[in-house]
Amino acid sequence: MATARPLHRQRVESPSGAVSRSHAGRLLCMAGALLVAATAWASGVSVPIDRFEVSGNTLLPQACVDEALGTAGADMDVPAMQAAAQRLQDAYRAAGWGAVVVLLPEQQPGSRVLHLQVVEGRVSQISTAGQYRFSRDNILRSVPALQPGRTPRLRDLDRELLLANTNPAKYSRVLLQPGFDTGDVEALVTVEERPLRPWRIDLSNTGTPDTGRWRLAAQYQNPNVADRDMVLGVRAETSPERPSRVAVFSSTLRVPLYGAHTALEGALLASNTRSSTNTTTAGDMRFAGDGLSAGVRAIWLLPGLSESKSQLSLGLDVRRYRTECTLGDPGQAGCGPTGNNTQHALPLALGYTLYRPDSYMLNIQWVHNLPWGSAGRDSDYAANRAGADSRYQLLRLNAQVLGRLSPHWQLKWRLDGQVAPHALITAEQIGVAGSATVRGYEERALVGDSGASTSLELSTRLDTLLSQPVSDAWPTLSFFADAGRVSNHLGSPCRPGHSSCTLWSAGIGASWAVDNRFFLRIDAARAGTQVQETRRGDWKLHLGLTAQF
């Protein structure tokens, strides 16, 4: 009988969380080739096989092995034996075990048994490279699937890299390759640290005539609190023209739990907005609104080794909305209960996200409010809007598709929507006008219980289009068309005399990114529908400037 020898060896590449927008960060896995033996049987000669015998397996349940190999009892030639070994190899890969080799060793003629040898590669060495601000312990904590003496499971490693690469300050890849001895696997974790610019300033004209056209925000971010990859963010926003009328403060904390393939997110938000004084025959009228919110959300990364990724989320918020009105000498009494009201909300949100980097994203979220507190009754909600239900439910949808039409042109489609079966208070209604929805109109100029906005945008870099050297001085040009629609329950108007309203716009935009520190976006949109003070044919310029340092 001839000695066993490998007939071929191949390197298998597996998608992972290391996939970036450029698709350069793939997890390369030396899964091992299918090795077969050159036997004494001539090509085309079959021998009877009554059963399979597999040695070396500790990872797959016996039921999975039996299912992969099928039922024996037929004559098999060498290609059929190779196919059986390949089926078992595929079963390991399907279960996420990449560093496993199935061997077809030398067989004993006349035994009527097909012997298969499994070699489960185990990690013998773990190296890291590229990290400077992050410690080696930090990097290794983010990939607990890599443990000395254990076979790495690609399904787990894939999700760990996905979670690790949500950190804004680093990007990790893993390379698995054969070690010095048979069955050894050496792991190399390479880290690409991104520029650390903790401070960010945003300036945009997303305000209102009443509170000031401009909004100025300052943000601080720490991407590695306590060397545990916890990301802390703090943000404050106001109106530089009328700072006493707008104050928004928020804070977020994201905690990755790599072993559980889960991220926990916490958020705090406090806002206060005051309108200008309106003079009436009964005296000066002033409106003010404020909100408080605290929430937590858990995100589970679902297993999978394809290019598409998916996750589940479960969140719970505690919210308080308050509206105040004063009129003349009586103050709040002059506005009555409809002008002064408070609502407590405890919305529970369950979401599912499916996405492929640089290709598409789909998010579906179901929200159900749990009434709580002294202002969580139907009567409290009715004080804000007659007929509003404190046990409201929502179904939200967000989708995005990116496609490259040519080396120079890219097409992007976006959809954001909400469906509500009952009337909602103002704070929970959807807005479909403004810089992030339907451009060409004031922010939230059109709101409703249910609604959707969509956008189709064609973009290209001007320097590549004109065959010029790539430079930050050249902008990315975009041509877009936006549209939106809202509807209200109980006949509530979104425009005078209408409970269902539509709007649309079209325009052109330009954006610059300078040294990955300064970002400027300009959109000029022409309104196609009259909404409030915006007439059909009016043009509006949306500006956004960001500086990081």
Named regions from a protein language model:
Residues 2-17, 43-207, 236-247, 395, ...:
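Periplasmic polypeptide-binding modules associated with outer-membrane biogenesis and secretion
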Residues 172, 197-199, 226-232, 259-266, ...:
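Repeated loop/turn-to-beta-strand initiation elements of outer-membrane beta-barrel proteins
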Residues 176, 201-205, 216-218, 232-238, ...:
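Transmembrane beta-barrel strands of outer-membrane/channel proteins
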Residues 191, 222-224, 255-257, 300-302, ...:
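Residue-level signature of outer-membrane beta-barrel architecture
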Residues 220, 512, 537-549:
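Outer-membrane beta-barrel "beta-signal"
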Residues 243-352:
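Transmembrane beta-barrel wall of Gram-negative outer-membrane proteins
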